[in-house]
Amino acid sequence: MTDAKLLLERHKPRLVYDSLEAYFAGSAAIWTDFPYTRLRRADGTVLAAAPQLSLAFLGPHAYGDGRPVRAGDVIGETSRDYKQHAAEAHANVRYRNRVHGRARRDDQQRLWLQYWCFYYYNDFQLAGPLLSGGKHEGDWEMVQLRLDAAERPVVAVYTQHKAAESRPWSAVEKAPGSQDTPLVYVARGSHANYFTPGAHWTGVWFDNADGRGPRIDPAVVVLGDNSPAWAVWPGWWGDTKATSSPIDANSPRGPGGHRQWGNPALLAGVAARTAAAAAARPAAPASPPPPVIAVRRDGDRAVVAFDAPDAKGLVVAVRPAGSDEPARTISVPVSGTKGEVEVELGDDRAFELHASAADGNGAASAGAAAVVPER
């Protein structure tokens, strides 16, 4: 087999974010190396915090100080200021724009490339104040490719929540100028992975993946079969617990806690079951139309006038024009068809601004775009 790192670099996905996305895939160390998280037992006993807490401190059976690992152990955020802390982690070049790659053979000895993506927070950002579900600390998603005997991709499988979707390599959209690079359209807030841009009906909600955000070629952190040890740590990457909401979920286990870690073919089976179940889904309702917006600059703020019939909430996102930064977002409830909201910009640069409306059911619209001129 060709060196795993070479194969993983050759076919690493280009992550195409939604225009309103606030959380980008980064090193798993964004969850251990900063002072905002704690490793603790299920009863709340704190075991470690940074700088003692690090990826190297984690293991399948014992921690770096010799204490035993328990399956109920959790790394959780202390302040819940997810936006600020994720932004601080992303600002550090050592941590931002990473995927964790692994070459693994399945139970039929077919070779797969797995790309595990870690996100600081899972936030559907449908309308913030309207929905209490669909949000959790930590988010592991993945893309995997099956290679043939000549080590060329033949099948791609993308995770989508608890489901997955599979396509032959010939039907996968590639990056311009590179037939080796699959495009992965990342859904707003949920980070589900799609083969095409647009609004995707899951049977319960819409995932919006408009593909109008930054396009990132991440660096690959190479993983082995059961190494580094943090990858098979059995604890929880976040302390969020699901409620009765149909869009809610627990924080996830790490890569080694997923069945496809041991046998990549199992995810292809999930994709087959997902396709079969899709026929029984209820018909997709009409998604709300995007708001009509007009933006003016008032010093270090953007004033957004909107017209959004029947909207109950509005999400507004800004990033410096032309940058590859995650968006900064605010979510506000609204009443009436028309109104204004203000967004802090922070400096004199030009900004791109995107706005999405949500209806009373929490379904979010596609984004409307505008440019805030420099001051």
Where are these regions (language model features)?
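Beta-strand signatures of extracellular beta-sandwich domains
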Residues: V315-R319
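Aromatic sugar-binding surface patches on proteins
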Residues: S335-V341
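Surface-exposed, short loops/turns at beta-strand junctions within beta-sandwich domains
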Residues: E342-F351
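Extracellular fibronectin type III
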Residues: G360-R375
